[in-house]
Amino acid sequence: MISQERLLKVILAPHISEKSTVCAENDNTVVFRVAIDATKAEIKAAVAQLFEVEVDSVRTLVNKGKTKRTGARMGRRVDWKKAYVTLAAGAEIDFVGAE
């Protein structure tokens, strides 16, 4: 069993983009930014508990940080992890929070 404290640290934010909007409309898939060390099992448990929905599958990928120039120095942005969470048929997550 995963601790409640860990579940709250796994999901960082929803990832909003054109592709994530298309996935949400067509495939019932929601995209989240997650902790870099989060596993698929932790992501599935966190989404199921926090949003009270049934999760079918989780796909993850790590985006490598880009190299950026700041003046004469070269810096690097941090790596981050993205998770595509497919919800069960009929399940839905509303981020707008309409009343």
From Swiss-Prot:
Q: Name one GO biological process term.
A: translation
On whether Ribonucleoprotein is a keyword of this UniProt record, the answer is yes
Which cellular components does GO assign to this protein? ribonucleoprotein complex; ribosome
Mind telling me which NCBIfam families this protein's record contains? PRK05738.1-1, PRK05738.1-3, PRK05738.2-4
State the family it belongs to. Belongs to the universal ribosomal protein uL23 family.
Quaternary structure, per UniProt, is: Part of the 50S ribosomal subunit. Contacts protein L29, and trigger factor when it is bound to the ribosome.
Query: What is the protein name given in its UniProt record?
Result: Large ribosomal subunit protein uL23
